[in-house]
Design a protein with these regions (language model features):
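Substrate-binding pocket helix/loop in short-chain dehydrogenase/reductase
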Residues: 93-94, 101-103
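Conserved glycine-rich cofactor-binding loop
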Residues: 10-12
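Residue(s) in the substrate-gating loop at a strand-loop-helix junction
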Residues: 137
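Conserved glycine-rich Rossmann-like NAD(P)H-binding loop of the short-chain dehydrogenase/reductase
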Residues: 24-40
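The beta1-alpha1 cofactor-binding region of Rossmann-like NAD(H)/NADP(H)-dependent oxidoreductases
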Residues: 56-67, 99
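SDR active-site lid
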Residues: 170-237
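Active-site helix of classical SDR
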Residues: 117, 153
Length: 291
């Protein structure tokens, strides 16, 4: 049995990951910014009599992470597995979004994960044992409007995770990156709504891609099972695309030169919708204009 700390467990991937590890017999320390939002997790853990302990930890706060880690280690011993799942999204054009939005997303998605890793690395290094799993996204390998704040944060997380993997392999600590595609979470469904009218057509187009993909939703439990598999597995691999569209999205981007990719995303709506339909079999056109 391992002791597992998971951030961002109030819903979605984090909640399902907490349940998956607990069902597998591990002790789960489920953290979130506001434990008042833990009702679903608490009820499911209680109903199944699962070893899940819920506590407050705000990954945006040095004080919260430091004190949380100290308390956990005193009460539960060393942490064997860290799953950095806490994350937020924001969509919009770079011109229209306030700078504070970029800072806020980066604070949670990148610095939040980094903060937790730095807090736990000394004990893992000294014990020469441990596993860190960072939840990124296919967005960590693809960049396109209108998700620049989110994508920038995931690119940063991918970079620091790859660097950390090289540093910690010497100490027998595994680092892995999970790259989900479009998963049925509240975060994904928020991106469905293009919101206010914008001169940037990409904002509306991307929302329609999410609408089309979520017609056949992929449960967060699929990602949770992959995270558990990585943690319990003997064979180490750095990156793990998850979900039926994850690898295809990455392969789609890889087939374009940088200039071709920019031109596609800067092009007119008809060309963009046609290319997505050709390559993915998805009609992402808005219903009012679909053929």
């Amino acid at each position: 049995m391992a002791t597992v700390l998971i951030t961002g467990t109030s819903k979605g991937i984090g909640l399902h990951t907490a349940l998956a590890f607990a069902r597998a017999g591990h002790k789960v320390l489920a953290t979130m910014r506001n434990p008042a939002r833990a009702q679903e997790l608490a009820e499911r853990a209680s109903a199944e009599k699962l070893p899940i302990l819920i506590s407050a930890m705000d990954v945006d706060s040095d004080h919260s992470v430091r004190d949380g880690m100290t308390t956990i280690e005193k009460e539960h011993g060393a942490i064997d597995i860290l799953v950095n799942n806490a994350g937020v999204e924001a969509s919009g054009s770079i011109e229209e979004l306030p700078l504070e939005t970029f800072r806020s997303v980066m604070e949670t998605n990148y610095f939040g994960a980094l903060r937790c890793m730095k807090a736990i690395l000394p004990q893992m290094r000294q014990r020469r044992s441990g596993c860190i799993i960072n939840i990124s996204s296919v967005a960590g390998k693809i960049s396109s409007a209108p998700l620049s704040p989110y994508m920038a944060s995931k690119w940063a997380l991918e970079a620091v995770s790859e660097a950390l993997a090289g540093e910690m392999k010497t100490f027998n600590v595994r680092v892995a990156i999970v790259e989900p595609g479009i998963i049925d979470t509240s975060m994904a469904r928020r991106i469905e709504d293009p919101g206010a009218v914008s001169p940037y057509r990409q904002k509306t187009r991307f929302s329609h891609l999410f609408v089309a993909s979520l017609k056949n939703p992929v449960s967060p439990s699929v990602v949770a099972e992959k995270i558990l598999e990585i943690a319990e597995g003997d064979i180490w691999t750095l990156r793990h695309p998850v979900g039926p569209d994850a690898a295809p999205f990455l392969q789609w981007r890889a087939q374009f030169t940088d200039e071709e990719w920019v031109n596609l995303n800067a092009g007119d709506d008809d060309a963009w919708y046609a290319r997505v339909e050709r390559d993915f079999g998805l009609d992402t056109r808005p219903k009012s204009t679909a053929a």
